[in-house]
């Protein structure tokens, strides 16, 4: 294990100590920091952003992380690749149940889930904001999709985005049985 791997392990542990939303919260926070929508951060932005969240990296660690995930030689890290590396690996059982849930949602079978795909399996009619007239059912479906739609809010969720979302959830669950039961119940598999 090299110094950057050790740094990633340190960050992963700090994130996981924050519970289910540790890595997901970090992802949302970094996307807000990325004001130019380049999907990248330099070492100073990374270090400052982590510090705001109470996660500590020294300058050398931040620079090492940026070098590892610098895909184009610009001196910045690729945000999505970095966040993916922070998430712990998943077992085959977890990957399989995520794929099964995605397949159920992808009614058209084209490899992406859209609002049209959701209409048959998710109803927003009973959502409190629909009931109050504040949102339409279409808005509820779109906002639901946005939970999974990671980089570009294009109204389409790929299997990779779905897996990324659930790898963050998976990190907070100790056993495969617990995770599989949650997914099976949530998606009526």
From Swiss-Prot:
UniProt keyword Metal-binding, yes or no: yes
EF-hand domain mapped to chain residues: 21-56, 57-92, 93-128, 136-172
What SMART domains does the record point to?
EFh
Where Phosphoserine occurs, residue numbers? 40
Query: Per UniProt, which keywords does this protein have?
Result: Calcium, Cytoplasm, Metal-binding, Phosphoprotein, Repeat
The protein's PTM annotation reads: Phosphorylated in response to thyrotropin and cAMP.
Which parts of the sequence bind Ca(2+) 2?
Answer: 70, 72, 74, 76, 81
Task: Report the superkingdom from the record.
Answer: Eukaryota
Query: Self-association or partners: how does it assemble?
Result: Monomer. Does not form oligomers in the presence of calcium.
What function does the entry list?
A: Calcium-binding protein. May play a role in cellular signaling events (Potential).
What protein does this entry describe? Calcyphosin
Could you tell me which species this protein originates from?
Answer: Canis lupus familiaris (Dog)
